[in-house]
Amino acid sequence: MENCSSDAVVLHHFDYGEADRIVTLFSLEKGLIKGIARQARKSRKRFGAALEPFSTVHMRWQSRSGRDLVTLQDAELIDLRSGLRHNLLAMALAAYGCELVENLVGETGAQPPVYDLLTAFLTHVNHHGGSEEARLLLELRLLCLSGYAPHLVHCCKCGASFTSETVAFAASLGGSLCLDCVTGVDVQYLSLLSLGSLARALKAPLALFEGFRFGSQTLQQGGQVVSSMLRQQLTRPVKSLSFLSQLTEGSARVAAIR
């Protein structure tokens, strides 16, 4: 038996049996953790509000060799991020971000840069609400931290610099293509301006989400390119994406009417 503790983000939970709760966390010290909080629904003394999704906590647990679930002992709440529960779009985006981290990173052990990115993302959305910029930045940065950084500034086949205003992108090759190299490859097209915006975003600090203002074309084209890369790497669908897409489309229609 091993006693462990770490700061962690609560990704999600579900009730188990009459009083227990199964909790999935992404921790600073151990990465992805799944544990059982016994009697969590009957007694709030050990956990209180610390098992709420999107919260940052300091969690203590016991693990045993050969068992998938650790036993959660108690937790200290660091940041509840209560603002997310008053904004449906922000909450949906937070849920998507947490699920994306779980699916893309998986059980690969400690990944401090991913932990820092996730906490910065959740804090930003908690204070500023959901936005397409925040989603695009999270997706792009997660791809990079997971080893799938898109090749943007030169043709990924011939290495040439881009001279035309339109650039092709092949998710299957993981990067951009000049127009001379698109034969026989399934591609998407985006403007050189959009490509440059994505490249500049990758140079910014991982935890920085404020101050980004992408044009509508960059959001659309960049979002399509990043989504195609995510589909290449994810082994299962992101369930929360459907609800987030419904909310995002609804918000866009309302904005168009105003």
Swiss-Prot record:
Signal peptide: none annotated. One of its GO terms (cellular component) is bacterial nucleoid. Keywords: DNA damage, DNA recombination, DNA repair. Gene3D superfamilies: Nucleic acid-binding proteins, Recombination protein O, C-terminal domain. GO terms for biological process: DNA recombination; double-strand break repair. InterPro entries: ARFGAP/RecO (IPR037278), DNA_rep/recomb_RecO_N (IPR022572), NA-bd_OB-fold (IPR012340), RecO (IPR003717), RecO_C (IPR042242). It comes from the Bacteria. Involved in DNA repair and RecF pathway recombination. Belongs to the RecO family. This is DNA repair protein RecO. The gene is recO.
